[in-house]
Structures are given as C-alpha cells and as structure tokens.
Amino acid sequence: MKTQAKSYYTVTKVIDGDSFFVDTGAEVRILGINAPEIGRCGSQEAKELLSKLIFNKKVKVSPTASDSFHRLVADVYLDNQSVNNQMVASGWAAYDSSDSQNAKEMQTSGENARKNKIGIFSEKCSQTIPPSPNCKIKGNDNDTDGNKLYYPPNCGTRYDNITVDLFRGDQWFCSEKEAQEAGFAKTKVCP
C-alpha cells in the first residue's frame, strides 16, 4: 500500500479504537484521533465501536504518512463517511490535531463530545471528584512530554482545575508515597 494511494481494503482485524489491519497485511493508524490504550478506561468500548463500524468491511484508506511503528497513518472512510470523525463524535476517541482533511469537523465533534460528557469524557473516564474520599491526590500522566505529575488537594485552584483522565493514564492516589512509587513527581506549582 503506497503512502499517497487512495484505495479500498477489507478490514481483517481491529487492534484497538484507532488502529487496524487490512487484507494486504498493512496496519493502519487512524489520522487525527487518539483512542485509549488497551486496559485504560474506555479502551474496550472504543475497540468495540471501531469493530462494529469497519470490521470485515471495505473501507477507503487515504494514507498521509507512516509512523514510528511502521503503520500507515490515514483518513479512513466507510460509505463516504469519515470513520475518523465518527470515532471522535462518539466520544470514544479524542481529537488530536492533525492535517486530516476532516480536521475542522473532528475538532467540532471533539468539542461536542467533551461538552456533553460522552464516552471517554463521561464521569466514568474523566473525573474531578475522587471516587474515594481517602484518595484525593490527582496524578496526571502527560503522554506528550512524558511528565507524570501529582497534585495534592492543598494546591488550591490549581488542584480544582485538574481533571483525572483515566483514559489517558491519569490516576487517583491515596498518599504521596503511593504516587511517587507509581513514578509520579509532585508538581512544583503546589506547596
């Protein structure tokens, strides 16, 4: 499959909510979206939705590049509908800025999913209130820069503005020691 080609392929295996294999054996990563990694909050729902949408169906794959894992990064269409946008609109994948020809549509869909708290943006996967009153330390795992920071409740308004996105690998902790043992460092913006 050439990087610039626009062709139809049958989906033979769905790996997770944003990647799959086609009948040529090529692995495709959907452009402009980020679904939860396997085992994280919402990962099963994202994979199930993508499977329901495209498994065993012919999709149009419009690759733009290859990634560091040698996957084709592509806009994907089923019946002339953007699969990229359908995943974002469902709330089971986050919009991740891209050069997709559907970028504006995906950005709007992502904003709507977040505003309406659906999918990974629901209270199941995106939390500001701790599930246990004894475990109030917020741990943020920033995938983009590798920083894993924790915020104790005495952080004031900074603490109040932090969301624990379980779908991104964020966690709640019961003690600073527990956070540190999990590889998180205390943020410098808190006392």
Located regions from the model:
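Stable alpha-helical elements in mature extracytoplasmic
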Residues: A46-L50, D79, V83, V88, ...
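Mature, structured domains enriched in cysteine- and short glycine motifs
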Residues: A89, A94-S98, E111-P191
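Electropositive
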Residues: K2-S100
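Polybasic, low-complexity, intrinsically disordered segments
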Residues: M1-K2, E111
